[in-house]
A protein has these predicted regions:
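OB-fold/S1-family single-stranded nucleic acid-binding modules
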Residues: 450-472
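Cys/His-rich short segments
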Residues: 339-397
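Short aromatic-glycine-enriched beta-strand elements
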Residues: 408-420, 461-465
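Conserved catalytic cysteine-centered active-site region
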Residues: 24-28, 32-45, 72-125, 235-267
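Condensing-enzyme catalytic core mediating Claisen C-C bond formation in acyl metabolism
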Residues: 1-43, 139-196, 200, 276, ...
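Short nucleic-acid-contacting surface segments enriched for D/E, G, S/T with interspersed K/R
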Residues: 435-449
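Conserved hydrophobic positions within beta-strands
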Residues: 398-400, 433
Length: 472
């Protein structure tokens, strides 16, 4: 039976207090905080983080597909899934696809992955949902939105979560949308949108699921329920007859915010972190219709506890000191023109060195075992020529050997910290440090690698691996 074999999650390091948002606009923005992607993060980089977490300790050769779900892919015309697959070091002989333009894209991708495995077209399929939505300043969405990602490995062996039943329907109802070329979201009057849209649609889907399988709220250990906001979440929980104190998964509104297509998947990851064998979960996602699933947790859940998931990332955070820092990260203002030549890129170089850039492959000398980056023809230790094998470095941790700080660099967050990292197992890597406190950078600091968007030279996103302090 096809089901969830593994899971992973990601929440950016930075948080923005809703109190700061309210002070910026002299209004009330609610309680709690929302997650904020760093200036070099987007839905693709966060998706890779979730995939890395999901695949922790697993072989990748059996994966036959990757489906990427998002309403904010970095390219309007260019597949994101193929880049995520390369950065995640998946085999080239896989099927990739993007699912987009709907908040329900995450469960849509999951359903197709389940069908793919059931049909025998792939042994395993990796599904990742990630969103990095930007709300209009001083809008109702600005304090509500958050950034994050979740990933699930779908397979038919060592299944940790069985798909015991499902119900879905499509709807053309308009609630939140963006037109072609628009950055910010539109919506209609709240009572109409919620009463005729979310509330009515979810109630219809869950009632149909209960009737189809002969179940009631008492048959479930946990309800994982998508909602547009906390108020409507509480309303529908009551309407469906679930106990809000004992049966309902916390919806992350006060700690992360609404993460778009990744919102329901991230809540499911949080639920699975606490799930025990024998638990039964009702998983409901909404957006242009409804997907509802009955999930059964097996004993295999105990074998995938070593994930950072949601709990670890919730505890690992850094508060933005000002609202203006968020404005800078999101590029919400027109800035003074830079007095320097523009960033440039070379597609031939990016293609020729793709294994070193996206997959972060170094080479290991077959004669002496020395690991080296970037790949070169001659071993720097024993001088053996053209006798090496490529090795993956992206999942290695390391220590800072030396570093420098540039206070005049043209980056959104000064200083620009450059370092040389000694990787565990061998290899030395020259890169930038992100998600950092400059005052805490020191020689010997433990770091890990993360893929980020270095710049947008020549009209394309230039992704590369950076160092960051290990999130603990």
């Amino acid at each position: 039976m096809a089901g969830i074999v593994s899971y992973g999650g990601y929440i950016p390091l930075y948080r923005l207090s809703r109190e700061l948002i309210g002070k910026a606009w002299m209004t009330t923005a609610g309680l709690g905080e929302r997650s904020v992607a760093n200036w070099d993060e987007d839905s693709l980089t966060m998706g890779v983080e979730a995939c890395t977490d999901c695949l922790n300790g697993r072989e990748r050769q059996a994966i036959g597909g990757l489906y990427f779900a998002s309403t904010t892919p970095p390219y309007r015309e260019k597949q994101t899934a193929s880049i995520v697959a390369a950065a995640s070091n998946l085999p080239r002989e896989i099927f990739t696809a993007d699912f987009t333009d709907s908040i329900r894209a995450g469960t849509s991708a999951m359903q197709v992955a389940i069908d793919t495995v059931k049909a025998g077209s792939a042994k395993e399929v990796l599904v990742v949902a990630s969103d990095c939505r930007t709300a209009a300043p001083n809008s109702e969405f600005e304090p509500l939105f958050g950034d994050g990602a979740a990933a699930f490995l779908i397979g038919d062996s060592e299944v940790a979560v069985n798909i015991e039943g499902s119900y879905t329907f499509s709807s053309e109802f308009m609630d939140v949308w963006r037109l072609e070329g628009e950055r910010f979201h539109r919506t209609w009057e709240d009572r109409f949108v919620q009463a005729e849209g979310y509330v009515a649609h979810v109630r219809e889907a869950v009632s149909a699921l209960f009737k189809k399988y002969g179940v009631t709220p008492k048959d479930f250990t946990k309800l994982v329920l998508y909602a547009p906001n906390a108020r409507r979440h509480n309303e529908v929980v009551r309407n469906l007859g679930f106990d809000a104190k004992t049966q309902v998964q916390e919806p992350l509104f006060n700690t992360v915010g609404h993460t778009g297509a990744a919102f329901a998947p991230m809540m499911l990851v949080a639920a699975l972190e606490e799930a025990k064998p024998g638990d039964r979960i009702l998983y409901v996602n909404y957006g242009d219709g409804v997907d509802a699933y009955i999930l059964g947790v097996t004993e295999q859940i105990e074998n995938i506890r070593n994930r950072r998931g949601i709990k670890h990332h919730l505890a690992s955070k850094s508060m933005l000191p000002t609202y203006e820092k968020y404005v800078r990260f999101r590029n919400l203002m027109e800035w003074e023109a830079e007095r320097r030549p523009p960033d440039i890129s070379s597609l031939p170089v990016l293609w020729r060195e793709r294994n070193q850039i996206l997959r972060l492959h170094g080479h290991k000398c077959r004669q002496c075992g020395t690991i080296q980056y970037p790949i070169q023809r001659v071993c720097t230790w024993c001088q053996t020529k053209d006798d090496f094998e490529e090795v993956r470095l992206s999942d290695k941790q390391g220590t800072i050997f030396t570093f420098s700080m540039d206070e005049r660099a043209m980056v959104p967050e000064l200083p620009n910290v450059i370092c040389i990292v000694d990787l565990e197992g061998g290899g030395r890597f020259y890169t930038r440090v992100t998600d950092r406190d400059p005052g805490k950078i020191e020689v010997g600091m433990k770091v890990e690698l993360t893929i980020r968007n270095m710049h947008d030279g020549s009209g394309l996103h230039n992704y590369f691996w950076l160092a960051r302090p290990i999130r603990s």
